[in-house]
Design a protein with these regions (language model features):
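Conserved beta-strand segments that form the floor/walls of ligand-binding pockets within enzyme
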Residues: 79, 116-118
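Metal-dependent polysaccharide deacetylase catalytic core of the NodB/CE4 family, i.e.
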Residues: 103, 119-123
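Conserved, mostly hydrophobic/aromatic
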Residues: 35, 117, 135
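Residues immediately flanking
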Residues: 37-38, 119, 158
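Generic alpha-helix detector with strongest preference for long hydrophobic helices that associate
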Residues: 59, 67, 98, 116, ...
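N-terminal catalytic cores of peptidoglycan-degrading enzymes
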Residues: 1-108
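Basic/polar, cationic surfaces and motifs that engage anionic cell-wall
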Residues: 2-11, 108, 113, 122-187
Length: 187
């Protein structure tokens, strides 16, 4: 799994371009990965709804919840589905609209310096082994492409928007992810 520096694309991901992104500030290095959880409708896995949501094509009449989120313009760089399928919506050099109002280590506007990775899931249902495996591979590929991303620079949405967001939730096993990532590389 590799990141193409010119395109900002991950070679292992299915590409579904989202219009919901803009340019990052030019002088800000990418040094953080934010892990999210998403399911549409809430608690339902599979189907076309996440792709449709991130591409502004969600049919508000398909489910009552979709009327509540109609008009939201959000995205993430990547989605890891329950079966491990990897989808990319925004090139990494672009600023995806995933973290919203956020702050980490005294810096606000986390979208400026982070990569957003959505996991298909909810806060209180265990994530799948395939998702942990693919997420670890993604983190290694991103760290190789963006050296400022260190092992301790992978956090949850809950860490950058406490009180506002809870994902990826208590069902996400951070220790399991750390084991898959292995020891930090010597620099």
């Amino acid at each position: 799994m590799n990141v193409d520096a010119a395109s900002g694309r991950l070679d292992a991901a299915r590409q579904v371009p989202s219009p919901n992104w803009d340019a990052r500030p030019g002088d800000v290095p990418i040094d953080l990965i934010i892990v999210h959880g998403i399911s549409l409708p809430p608690g339902v896995f599979g189907g076309p709804w996440i792709d449709a949501f991130f591409t502004n094509a969600l049919d508000a009449g398909a489910h009552p919840y979709f009327r509540e989120i109609k008009g939201l313009r959000v995205s993430a760089h990547l989605l890891v589905r329950r079966d491990g399928e990897l989808v990319q919506y925004v090139p990494f050099h672009g600023r995806a609209w995933h973290a919203g109002e956020s702050r980490y280590e005294g810096r606000s506007r986390c979208n400026d310096f982070s990569i957003g990775v959505e996991l298909e899931g909810v806060d209180d249902v265990a994530y799948e082994e395939a998702q942990y495996r693919v997420l670890a591979e993604v983190i290694h590929a991103l760290a190789a492409a963006y050296p400022a991303i260190a092992p301790d620079r992978v956090v949850g949405h809950c860490d950058v928007a406490p009180g506002r967001k809870s994902d990826p939730g208590p069902a996400f096993d951070w220790a399991r992810l750390r084991r898959l990532l292995g020891p930090p590389l010597a620099t």
